[in-house]
UniProtKB/Swiss-Prot annotation:
Belongs to the CbiM family. NikM subfamily. The chain crosses the membrane at residues 8-28, 42-62, 75-95, 103-123, 138-158, 187-207, 229-249, 296-316. This is Probable fused nickel transport protein LarMN. Keywords: Cell membrane, Ion transport, Membrane, Nickel, Nickel transport, Transmembrane, Transmembrane helix, Transport. InterPro entries: CbiM/NikMN, PDGLE_dom. GO terms for biological process: nickel cation transport. It is a multi-pass membrane protein. The gene is larMN. One of its GO terms (cellular component) is plasma membrane. The lineage of its organism: Bacteria, Bacillati, Bacillota, Bacilli, Lactobacillales. Probably part of the energy-coupling factor (ECF) transporter complex LarMNQO involved in nickel import.
Length: 328
């Protein structure tokens, strides 16, 4: 689901990040109002971002030799509201790209549109319909499933349009080499068959956990929120995160230029990777692929998870201190 750099043309990336700018602006304004009404929203933003980050570390094997993962977009929308979920997921995606090389820097707008807008808003709309019809959990499950699959569909469209939008004079693709007839089925198959159902399971389990141990931690409950169950949940997920390493293959559409070149050669499509990808923007993250030099992969994975959680919580603590200071 995380589109790397050089799979989308610079024009596509620029268009999508420009389209996201007003969405982020509205989200910030909406969340500021929400925080004024319910101060507990601010610390929950850090918890929500941490939760999404950890959920996305659990990669799953997909038939055909690729992987996929859940995201938690609908879950976050139910916990803190869709606009706050948009911001939490945006910050999560930004940290993943900058620190861990998961998702592109230039493709950040595309990934934010898919996972921080489409997923939480589609999922939350289904959840609210379920509530209206007195089938809360059913609405939540449908929202989680539809949300991630709608995001996958849009990602497939973004990738599949590239051979049409950006190509050489001879018609060779400059960026993603696969057309819509390949990208859409590839993205949807992985999410319809596997990732969508795991998204449902994660969403229902955490929702049930919250309803049981901290029912005030839901968006529509304007009472003081207990953070202790969340800290326990986050620590548990961080410790279990190396399970995501069991699926070692690369997710569809996230290959390096070298991996893509091998695939294209095996499929008798081309003997080289697209030129725009080979000569495009390349960013080396500090802890690329959640690995820390000199440490076992599983240990690096856990430390990456804990580092991300600490960054989110410290960031929110700083914002909370600044908010409290300005109010006094």
């Amino acid at each position: 689901m995380h589109i790397p750099d050089n799979y989308l043309s610079p024009a596509t990336c620029g268009t999508l990040v420009t389209a996201m700018a007003p969405v982020w602006t509205v989200a910030v304004l909406k969340v500021k109002v929400q925080i004024k009404k319910h101060h507990e929203t601010l610390p929950m933003l850090g918890i929500a971002a941490s939760l999404a980050f950890l959920i996305m570390m659990f990669n799953l094997p997909i038939p055909g030799g690729t992987t996929a993962h859940a995201v938690g977009g609908t879950l976050l929308a139910v916990l803190i509201g869709p606009w706050a979920a948009c911001l939490a997921l945006t910050v999560t995606l930004l940290l993943q790209a900058l620190l861990f090389g998961d998702g592109g820097i230039l493709a950040f707008g595309a990934n934010a549109l898919n996972m921080a807008v489409i997923m939480p808003f589609v999922g939350y709309a289904c959840y609210r319909l379920g509530q209206k019809w007195h089938h809360e959990k059913l609405g939540l499950a449908i929202g989680a499933y539809l949300g991630i699959n709608m995001a996958a569909l849009v990602a497939g469209i973004e990738l599949g349009l590239q051979p049409i939008l950006a190509h050489t004079a001879s018609g060779a693709p400059l960026y993603c080499p696969y057309g819509l007839n390949i990208t859409i089925p590839a993205m949807l198959t992985a999410h319809l068959l596997v990732a969508g159902w795991v998204e449902v399971v994660f969403t229902l389990l955490v929702f049930q956990f919250v309803k049981r141990v901290a029912p005030t931690n839901l968006y529509q409950t304007p009472t003081r929120r207990n953070q202790r169950p969340w800290i326990a949940l986050l620590l548990g997920l961080a410790v279990l995160s190396p399970l995501g390493l069991l699926a070692s293959n690369t997710a569809w559409g996230e290959w390096s230029p070298q991996e893509l070149q091998q695939r294209l050669a095996q499929q008798h499509i081309s003997t080289h990777a697209p030129q725009g990808m080979v000569h495009g923007f390349h960013f080396q993250a500090l802890f690329s692929d959640y690995a820390i030099a000199g440490l076992p992969v599983s240990v690096g994975y856990i430390l990456s998870a804990i580092t991300a959680v600490l960054i989110f919580l410290l960031l929110i603590r700083g914002l909370q201190h600044e908010t409290d200071t300005s109010q006094h």
